[in-house]
């Protein structure tokens, strides 16, 4: 089931959850959605429970004990509806409370949730809707149709808008289940009864539409047909949906018991799921009603289903308790539709709409086909609809760009982009390609519109394209595309630095912390290091570059802090930290090598500068670390030469893995060159470890160059086990042989499958080993038997030859014998050798080898010995046969009686020696084709013919009788003359005849058959042979047919006559039929083939058979001989062709004769069609009295149909009689209208009560100006909304406006008055009686189609009425716009104020402000008070300012200032300045900070009033412009303000300048006050100098005394701190000396390459590196950070 188009699974098994099978049924189980299943169950102890199962959590079953008649769960929420008697309740399960209840007046028969908010209730007579919100009772929606009375309701559905409803019921009739559906329109309030079993609604977007239509799907199974029907009940904004229908297949074996029970629609896939009672699932395409898939999903009856939203499928429950889920399989549905259904159009449509895989090739092919055919619009549509980027890519765009433009037509590329924009959003590539030409043409508004509608995918590249044209637009694109760098760049270019900061905070952009860090490094180095670590490691960071921190610390010689910082931030091993890792290791190698070694040993860092660190390691004596870091071969050789013996061998083997193969080989050669014996084991170990990298060939060459075969053997011993290289295996064999490891040579030759056999063979020959077994093994394995035999024979090693054939491989004895024969070995030796092998030698090969050399007789003793032993091998007997044939030793007897030789082999051997013996051998072995060939070559045709007759092989006959056989004629002669006449076997004769037939030899077959049938005696009366003879003559020699018919009597004429007809032997066929009394067939030949109706008439007269007359009548009918054919049919009493006769009579207008014929037919059969035609014939011949008598008598005629025919043929009087007879008042009305009887027509129309009839009479009365009667008709028409527009058009086209208005006004009193009537009357008032329009709108507004009336008012420029409609239709934007544009007629201030807050388009606020400022300026503040909460104050103030009315709106500005908007604040401040209201200005500044403070200060500092200049100084101080603030205060002699500004600045320069000013002004009090206020930042030396120079020390003493007191306190604190630190340092040094004295290293007991303690290398320092002698310390990696200070002290610091 992996390739099915559906996913099918069992969701739950209710019986496994403890639900009894008696509780699983339609009356006890409900499922309104996939979420809940609700069950009423009765326990064994008669307790009633309601069980609620949440399918998402089926293990948590909610079981409530309650007695209820029915229960149903809300599809979405945990709300339970209960029915107890006629009381309904809604209960919230979560809140455990009753939400609402009601009492039904009638018993409830069915209920269902049609939405999460509405519960539908069905009683015996009506349908109600009950909403779960509020306290309302159920509301009646419609009455049940009479057709649904006494039926069982099984379903109730609604569309998404609840404008269409459908009620589904079933009942029993004639032993089958009949379905009945009531479709109800809420808008039209009408019902329709339809036959059907299941129905549903769906929203569907018709191609070419943007708004969906509502489709209604219905499935039914009647006694005659089973169908599914899809039709449109509510139209969208596109073309009409064409009704679709499809047959539904039900397996014949299930009978009439199955029928549809439910239908669900997946609007995503546009698929209808239909489920039948017996468990069949049908999937139909919604748009075409075509069947997609059908299968059985349940063997039990399914009784309830629901739509499964999670999978867009269907969920169902069967009687067994299985909860089943069926949905579309996204992966398989499209391949299934393509491959199984072969519906490529549906596959493409579904794939495009749902982005499903499987149709890529179809789409591409379709696109290419359209494109190549020049159908670019269709190609563009295919590309636009295609999913993903299959076609929506750059290549497609380039294809459309390459199309040359066509004059006066839009380009193909433009059409393509237009379709893409209609489809939705463009992708990145499409957006770029579309924007480029738009920008080139300067059409920025279009681009802005697309961005507003989200039609383009924003990207950085798109922003780059837009940026040269519009930076603001590019900024918007960058922002949407998250191109932060470009956003920051644009902000910087425009000087919007505040926005940069805000953007950085929002998107975690890094500010510059370097300045702060520099200041901290000078004051608190350790604190700076900690802070730097936090900046780098902080979440969301790093906020600062670590390299810059290192440079900063290093420049200040903060070594310890740098090391601590680096070790703290380097948590992971990242490539970007390479410089930092290098710096960390460099510091420690220079000052603490042990720590560096520990760090490198932890392998925490790998990205540092390895060359730099390697050199430092070598200088520090860490040779192993140096080797790990060096990559240059010269460096490596240097270290190995100086300290190779001090490095561990295991490390060296491992280390060699880091070298490239060339360097590795160079080092190994150095080892072997300097001391091969000492270094051999090391080199072998290295070679084995890195054999694959160096390649075995290179290593072998290296060992061979030093002639170290022992080393080569040791190396290959390790490698050969896993190697598949032929060279490796050969070299191993060679090395083993050279060091005399012969057993290993033998083992490898036997076990290895990889060495080169020829090369190994040649080596072993040349080596001349003491034992030839390895050579024998190689030659035997690789079939070098001839070489082996030559080598052994020429070297006199015969014992190895005998041992080989006798013990090692006797099977190869033939090859050995052949080789020895070629060497002219003695025959006695060969016979003895062969006999010693006996039957172990294969006979066929031995015979072949000997026979090739013409020495076959050599084997005769051996062959006869084998036969004597009972050997039955064909090769042995073949050889004996050949020997006997050559020696002529009674060969024919041997060939006839020996059963074991191969006939083909021996026959072939005899062909040139004795052809007859070859024939004997071939015949014995049934070698057909060989026998044919040898007899053809040797003209043995008689033997061949007898063999063929006896053989009876059709294939063989076909072979010899083919045209390619040049001996065919000779063979046929022998068969006809000798072989077949000799045969008395009927089977042989039959096989031979059949062979001639199959070979298509008709003349030869006739010759053969005449020989057998006409001349022979035994087969003369054979019926089959007579038939065959005549048949062959028909096909081969037509002239003989008549003679054969006369001479032969035992043939089958009924079978041969049709064949004769096929061969156009019509007279012969007629003669055959006539000879054997087949009269019907005979006349048929005369009519059909000979074409003589006259001969046929004479023949019929002679025969006088009814069947013959029937045939004749049919022929006459076809010949349009109407009178004659009617006569013939009457004689034949044949009514079968009455329809054709009627049609012919109508064509010839022979109704008089037709009446006779139909009267004859009516006597024989009572067919409604015959009686109907008889009535019409009466009407045509104007026999109305006979017609009326006939229709009043019992009859089964279709009087309605006949009446319609009479009406169509203008026989109105006859039609009137017929319609009156059947009371068809609708058609009767039409007749009366044609006859001009209008009053009678109105009376008949009233009885018909049909809209169509009323329309017909109305139109006739209007044309006849019978307005009273027309109004009677119109009253019955206008109540139908669909007909109203046409009726209005009829009146208006004829200019009867008053009559039309009178008609509609009279119709408003009707109970059936609808929206359309009120609407159309309003439109008529608008057109013709404007004075009545407003009154009509106010009285009947709620019953109007407002958009339609709005359109009429617009067309007729009725602005007050239009404004009224806009407001009541909630189109407040249009209402405001109308009042603004047409203020003289439509504006009303109160109405305007009430409406303006409700508008959606914000631009209207500002249009309203402009409107009021221009036309109603005194009411502007009243308007602004309403708009204030909603408008952009900045924009509003800018607008008012531009119009010059700022003072007019001061009340608005004051009331809105709490919003703290810059433009608003600045405008109000401007007004305060103009009004010289400094108090209000100061209050405004303090309360609101959002305005241009500097600009205002600059403006105020020149103001003539002091208080405004003081405010300017205050503003400078608030903006940290201390110097300007102080200077302004000094000018106005506001010394207190100046001193306070200087104090707030904390700037010593400003303070000193102010002191100097007071000294210059000799204002000593102000000088002292300034010292007191600015004490914390003034420098004492400057203060003392200034006071001393101006002789005012007394005024400075308070400052000096306070400063001395503070300074001495700080010095005392520093002295105490220094003493404490000194004491602590001494204690640490003492402890350090104690630890150093406890350990003395033993330098005499060192391991190979490593010190005995701690594993550190104990080597002298490198040349040129002066290392200070310090006691060696025990290293503890866990205390590394704590030990930094100690190591710094040991190495003397930095």
Curated annotation (Swiss-Prot):
Residues 1-478 are annotated as: Globular terminal domain. Residues 108-149 are annotated as: WD40-like repeat 3. Clathrin coats are formed from molecules containing 3 heavy chains and 3 light chains. PROSITE patterns: CHCR. The lineage of its organism: Eukaryota, Amoebozoa, Evosea, Eumycetozoa, Dictyostelia. Residues 23-67 are annotated as: WD40-like repeat 1. It is a peripheral membrane protein. Residues 448-464 are annotated as: Binding site for the uncoating ATPase, involved in lattice disassembly. CHCR repeats lie at residues 537-681, 687-829, 834-973, 980-1125, 1129-1270, 1275-1421, 1424-1567. InterPro entries: ARM-type_fold, CHCR, Clathrin_H-chain/VPS_repeat, Clathrin_H-chain_linker_core, Clathrin_H-chain_N, Clathrin_H-chain_propeller_rpt, Clathrin_heavy_chain, TPR-like_helical_dom_sf. This is Clathrin heavy chain. GO terms for biological process: actomyosin contractile ring assembly; aggregation involved in sorocarp development; clathrin coat assembly; clathrin-dependent endocytosis; intracellular protein transport; lysosomal transport; mitotic cytokinesis; pinocytosis. Signal peptide: none annotated. It is found in: Cytoplasmic vesicle membrane; Membrane, Coated pit. Residues 523-1694 are annotated as: Heavy chain arm. Residues 1551-1694 are annotated as: Trimerization. Keywords: Coated pit, Coiled coil, Cytoplasmic vesicle, Membrane, Repeat. It comes from Dictyostelium discoideum.
